[in-house]
Amino acid sequence: MAPILQRISKTFIKPSSPTPESLRCYNLSSSDQMITSVYISLAFFYGSPGCESSRIRQQLDNSLSRTLVYYYPFAGRLVDNDHIDCNDQGVQFVEVRIHCPISAILKQTTSYAEDLVFPRGTSACHEDSLVVVQLNRFECGGVAIAVCISHKVADGSGAIAFINDWAATARVSSHIPSPLLVADSIFPHLDNSLPVPYNLSKNCVTRRFVFPAAEIEKLKSKAVESGLQQPTRVEVVTALLYQCALLASRSTNSGLSRPSVLIQAVNLRPFLVPPLPRNSVGNIFSINFSIIEVDSLEFPELAGRLRKAKLKFQNLSQEKLYYDSQMQELGECLKQLNTGNFDVYYCSSWCRFPVYDVDFGWGKPTWVCTVKSQIKDMIVLMDSPGDEIAAFVTLEEEKMSAFQHNELLLSFASLYSAK
């Protein structure tokens, strides 16, 4: 029987102090403009906080309001993919009661039950809120806090910085957030920007696969045997998932293959000279393209291709001339992808991001997940307890049926529910 969801309230949380008129217009960078208007969505599951429901809500409301003073663009409204009007209209906050124990959600291997904890209609951004929060209460006393942040104001790193600052403000009343809001100071605003060509589909399913630490080490050893030096966890897991996705695509296409491209978002903060701090907020990333011919399906070669494509991001200058040239190169690649001659896959890694440090005052989360995506052929990687990696994979139904039964994949990963 499906869990019953009951809405308790819906309101808007505004900054506790008004944003100065001098900060009213927050210009989008070229990266902000290029990103499709979607939400970055995360849900954090906790056992019973051990305090009254009204106190939890008051604590979250007050701390969010104070945090928004420093993250003032998050409480504004997007204007014509050009800038954010920092008008303090606020963040949408929904509170619901889910009539089932939290364990009923965590035991699922599909995304259906998990999706209950996310606000309705957050597959694409609302015009009325760049951030949407949903507080979920369960029969057992446990709670889940879902946070959806528009990709127009932050990438994954910036979104998690905001959530951790909010949690720290709730936990320690003296905490003062100190985000570095980059706006268009690093990546200049462009008059004409091509969006990343996401492929949306209503026939997608999302499954989560967990790679234990020991199996990741086996994958790394396999890559080393083929000549790849010091492969990373993300490189080997991504390569295996990509290989299995290509095999699933071929099995559903009468054994025929098409050229494909893997688009990876690369966090530029550590690569820039000088590097940007973790509290930098904006879309501070570039796109890594790995184009694969139809006969290049072996894991070692895929891992090597991913490494080679990433090397170009070493020791980047923050000079405008460099970024302009990169945007021109990116624009040409996007034009090729928009021809429809490639199968396009996407991968975003949130590994090593402090998602399990989000403590609102009642302990760290027992489980963190993301929402079912409507972007087909999408892979999101996230750390899981015990040095594991959780992969949230979104494919069309027929392709997923082949993918989730791939023996190679299942020899390293499990179709998994939360512990």
From Swiss-Prot:
<comment type="similarity">
    <text>Belongs to the plant acyltransferase family.</text>
</comment>
<feature type="short sequence motif" description="Nuclear localization signal">
    <location>
        <begin position="206"/>
        <end position="213"/>
    </location>
</feature>
<comment type="function">
    <text>Acyltransferase involved in the biosynthesis of akuammilan monoterpene indole alkaloids (MIAs) natural products, components with various biological properties such as antidiabetic, antibacterial, anti-inflammatory, anticancer, and antimalarial activities. Catalyzes the conversion of rhazimol to akuammiline.</text>
</comment>
<dbReference type="GO" id="GO:0016747">
    <property type="term" value="F:acyltransferase activity, transferring groups other than amino-acyl groups"/>
</dbReference>
<dbReference type="InterPro" id="IPR023213">
    <property type="entry name" value="CAT-like_dom_sf"/>
</dbReference>
<keyword id="KW-0017">Alkaloid metabolism</keyword>
<keyword id="KW-0963">Cytoplasm</keyword>
<comment type="pathway">
    <text>Alkaloid biosynthesis.</text>
</comment>
<protein>
    <recommendedName>
        <fullName>Akuammiline synthase 1</fullName>
        <ecNumber>2.3.1.322</ecNumber>
    </recommendedName>
</protein>
<keyword id="KW-0539">Nucleus</keyword>
<dbReference type="GO" id="GO:0035835">
    <property type="term" value="P:indole alkaloid biosynthetic process"/>
</dbReference>
<dbReference type="GO" id="GO:0016746">
    <property type="term" value="F:acyltransferase activity"/>
</dbReference>
<feature type="active site" description="Proton acceptor">
    <location>
        <position position="151"/>
    </location>
</feature>
<comment type="subunit">
    <text>Monomer.</text>
</comment>
<dbReference type="Pfam" id="PF02458">
    <property type="entry name" value="Transferase"/>
</dbReference>
<keyword id="KW-0012">Acyltransferase</keyword>
<keyword id="KW-0808">Transferase</keyword>
<feature type="active site" description="Proton acceptor">
    <location>
        <position position="359"/>
    </location>
</feature>
